[in-house]
Swiss-Prot record:
MF annotations from Gene Ontology: nucleic acid binding
Taxonomic lineage: Bacteria, Pseudomonadati, Thermodesulfobacteriota, Desulfuromonadia, Geobacterales
Membrane-crossing segments per the record: none
Sequence similarity: Belongs to the UPF0102 family.
UniProt xrefs under HAMAP family: UPF0102 (MF_00048)
Stated name of the protein: UPF0102 protein Gmet_2864
Record-linked Gene3D superfamilies: 3.40.1350.10
Disulphide-bridged cysteine pairs: none
Family matches, as Pfam families: UPF0102 (PF02021)
Superkingdom to which the source organism belongs: Bacteria
Length: 122
């Protein structure tokens, strides 16, 4: 991954955190990594644990950012989510998978939040 892509991704994740906090989510962890995968943001929405994948683009040339959350990526996120829940001893917690899509194509970034974007994937 190029330095530009890492910088863009980091900027997108920071913007997503700000967005979630403004919508009264509590951020529990950022960039959780384990053997099975990675989760950009772990948050709490009321009593629900929310695993958030952030996809950031500079244009819609390759389609909307959320299309980059492939079935393979969903399986990786799911494995990481199960690991996170086990480490927190919260395997019985209500949880969901959201995607936040950010496009920087003009003055103001466009943010789309997709709650329940996908189900737990094996």
């Amino acid at each position: 991954m190029s330095l530009h892509n890492k910088s863009l991704g980091s900027k997108g994740e920071s913007l997503a955190v700000t967005y979630l906090e403004r919508h009264r989510y509590k951020i529990l962890e950022r960039n959780f990594r384990c053997r099975g995968g990675e989760i950009d943001i772990v948050a709490r929405d009321g009593k629900t644990i929310v695993f958030v994948e952030v996809k950031t683009r500079t244009s819609g040339h390759y389609g909307p950012p959320q299309l980059a959350v492939t079935s393979f990526k969903q399986r990786q996120i799911s494995k990481a989510a199960l690991t996170w829940l086990a480490k927190q001893r919260q395997l019985d917690a209500c949880a969901r998978f959201d995607v936040i899509s950010i496009t920087f194509s003009g003055q103001m970034p466009q943010i789309e939040h997709i709650p329940n974007a996908f189900e737990l994937a094996y």
